[in-house]
Amino acid sequence: MNSAVEAELAELGIEGYLSQHQHKSMLRFLTCGSVDDGKSTLIGRLLHDTKQIYEDQLAAVHSDSQRVGTTGEKPDLALLVDGLQAEREQGITIDVAYRYFSTQKRKFIIADTPGHEQYTRNMATGASTCDLAVILIDARKGVLDQTRRHSFISNLLGLKHFIVAVNKMDLVDYSQDRFEEIRDQYLEFAENLEGETNIQILPVSALEGINVAAPSKELAWFEGPSLLEVLENVDIDQKRSAGEFRFPVQYVNRPNLDFRGFAGTVASGRVSVGDEIKALPSGKTSKVARIVTFDGDLESAQAGLAVTLTLEDEIDISRGDLIVLENAQIESTNHVLADIVWMTEQPLQPGKAYDIKIAGKKTVGQVETVRHQYDINNLSTHAVDELPLNGIGLCEWSLNETVALDKYRESADTGGFIVIDRLTNVTVGAGLIRDRLDSVEQQVGNFSAFELEFNALVRKHFPHWDAKDLSQLLKS
């Protein structure tokens, strides 16, 4: 058992220990930055210095460090996070790795994201559920393209808190001049980020544990807090709980003739028994009769809670519909302006049909035009006809049906979507709705004769690929 946990259990008892941890606030954050900036090592150091590592884990790290470590005689703490064989052999992060730890003040969920450009989609996935970004910069290299890319994506995804950790200060002799040079370089770039962003910049050495969990004499010139102190005290606003009520229906629950409920997770806001609601896109209204959970009925439910709602009236609601309060100000449209993060080698092409998934709703859409692509180096824009792999651009989308939507910065769950290739069923992009546009009459989903014939051949000779029947998609 972890010695710190054992000591707490001895002092508080099991019930006291569980009660203490249950009432702590939760912070989700990600580590990002360029390749080899020390993201995994930093997380390993946080786990180690907060005594969150079990003795057998530490012994395994010491053993593995002799075989695949990159830190010489010292234990390679990055191995606590990089679990895939390919990651350990190459000394890089590929997949998003999640780790959990807690201190006396707070509980934490960390997403360790890859730094390589080809894994940008993994980084965007990790950032989409976080409240804060820890952006690492190698003190020897300064601000790089991936530093800017990850900062821009984090800002695009609505993160308002950035901690910029200038790592590997031990390799520049803890130079104050070098730290201030990098600080000024990053702040100049960050001036072009959208919205109000709280940025704190601090020097650290993840390998040596300098200024990670506690201040250090090596950085006596730095008067700011340690990384852990910032994480413990940063004030994260509870925007999801404070927003308007949104409930995307994931499943219509009808176990018998006497019960019909609508299951899903409250995306934002709060709902109570007796509240007047309306279902979108139909606009039909009713009242909440019950809020059902496995543990019994509730009087109210807030953001993040998975519940089943039953209504006083039998109105038509299906998977993908959105339940909101009757007086909610939300518009339905089939025409949106959205920022797109493109994640596949085949470029995003205007006019090509894609499956679009927004919360529980699945529809078909196509890009009418790519207005521009962002240049991550200076956040300027330039005109393009297509969006390439890892490109980020602003696009006009038309959908084949009217959908109730929010802007992404108002509600991530009902303002964000994923783009799915209709042939391979692979997620090829992520979209963040910037604005709703006037609805248009647009027919999407038409395929050429060659595409239909090729699809038929694939389904006949490669049935294990589970390719969709395009002729059926045209009828839907």
Curated annotation (Swiss-Prot):
Spell out the protein name for this chain.
Sulfate adenylyltransferase subunit 1
Q: Which PANTHER family match?
A: TRANSLATION FACTOR
Q: What is its EC number?
A: 2.7.7.4
Subunit-level organization: Heterodimer composed of CysD, the smaller subunit, and CysN.
Cite the entry's keywords alphabetically: ATP-binding, GTP-binding, Nucleotide-binding, Nucleotidyltransferase, Transferase
Q: Which domain of life is it from?
A: Bacteria
Gene name in the database record: cysN
Give the UniProt family note.
Answer: Belongs to the TRAFAC class translation factor GTPase superfamily. Classic translation factor GTPase family. CysN/NodQ subfamily.
List the Gene3D superfamilies. Answer: P-loop containing nucleotide triphosphate hydrolases, Translation factors
One GO MF term: ATP binding
Function, as annotated: With CysD forms the ATP sulfurylase (ATPS) that catalyzes the adenylation of sulfate producing adenosine 5'-phosphosulfate (APS) and diphosphate, the first enzymatic step in sulfur assimilation pathway. APS synthesis involves the formation of a high-energy phosphoric-sulfuric acid anhydride bond driven by GTP hydrolysis by CysN coupled to ATP hydrolysis by CysD.
**Binding residues annotated for GTP, in chain numbering:** 33-40, 112-116, 167-170
Q: Which residues does the annotated region (G5) include?
A: 205-207
Q: Catalysed reaction per UniProt?
A: sulfate + ATP + H(+) = adenosine 5'-phosphosulfate + diphosphate
